[in-house]
Amino acid sequence: MYFLYVGVFGALGGMCRYAMNLWLGGGDFPSATLAVNLIGCFLLAFLMQFLAEKSRISLVILNGIGTGFIGAFTTFSAFSVDTIQLVQSGAWLFAVSYVLASFIGGLIMVKFGRMLSNKLLNRGEHRVS
């Protein structure tokens, strides 16, 4: 059953990535790949923490979402190819900017995803000092 969920969610994630490519693709900078990777970092951090603690969704479906959807939506291989293409075309500033935005931005998006999840999970709690 796990493979079915990963496959179904993977197909949806791949279609969403393709749609983002159509919407943001083109130009000299790989903005579509950067966008899907940053969104994916946020979604993985948020959804995996929030859904695991708050919902009744089974672990099999959670893994399908994380491995399938987010895995197919994000792309390290396209990031790597895009970076090499920027370097080979002499666009060093774009290449360095892209690498920094991807890594630093990814970490920031994970932090935001976890912060939002924590905020929503702790929303109804009242602490007595």
From Swiss-Prot:
<feature type="binding site">
    <location>
        <position position="74"/>
    </location>
    <ligand>
        <name>Na(+)</name>
    </ligand>
</feature>
<dbReference type="GO" id="GO:0140114">
    <property type="term" value="P:cellular detoxification of fluoride"/>
</dbReference>
<dbReference type="GO" id="GO:0005886">
    <property type="term" value="C:plasma membrane"/>
</dbReference>
<dbReference type="InterPro" id="IPR003691">
    <property type="entry name" value="FluC"/>
</dbReference>
<feature type="binding site">
    <location>
        <position position="71"/>
    </location>
    <ligand>
        <name>Na(+)</name>
    </ligand>
</feature>
<keyword id="KW-0407">Ion channel</keyword>
<feature type="transmembrane region" description="Helical">
    <location>
        <begin position="3"/>
        <end position="23"/>
    </location>
</feature>
<dbReference type="GO" id="GO:0062054">
    <property type="term" value="F:fluoride channel activity"/>
</dbReference>
<dbReference type="GO" id="GO:0046872">
    <property type="term" value="F:metal ion binding"/>
</dbReference>
<keyword id="KW-1133">Transmembrane helix</keyword>
<comment type="similarity">
    <text>Belongs to the fluoride channel Fluc/FEX (TC 1.A.43) family.</text>
</comment>
<keyword id="KW-0472">Membrane</keyword>
<keyword id="KW-0813">Transport</keyword>
<feature type="transmembrane region" description="Helical">
    <location>
        <begin position="32"/>
        <end position="52"/>
    </location>
</feature>
<keyword id="KW-0812">Transmembrane</keyword>
<keyword id="KW-0406">Ion transport</keyword>
<keyword id="KW-0479">Metal-binding</keyword>
<dbReference type="Pfam" id="PF02537">
    <property type="entry name" value="CRCB"/>
</dbReference>
<keyword id="KW-0915">Sodium</keyword>
<feature type="transmembrane region" description="Helical">
    <location>
        <begin position="59"/>
        <end position="79"/>
    </location>
</feature>
<protein>
    <recommendedName>
        <fullName>Fluoride-specific ion channel FluC 2</fullName>
    </recommendedName>
</protein>
<feature type="transmembrane region" description="Helical">
    <location>
        <begin position="90"/>
        <end position="110"/>
    </location>
</feature>
<keyword id="KW-1003">Cell membrane</keyword>
<comment type="function">
    <text>Fluoride-specific ion channel. Important for reducing fluoride concentration in the cell, thus reducing its toxicity.</text>
</comment>
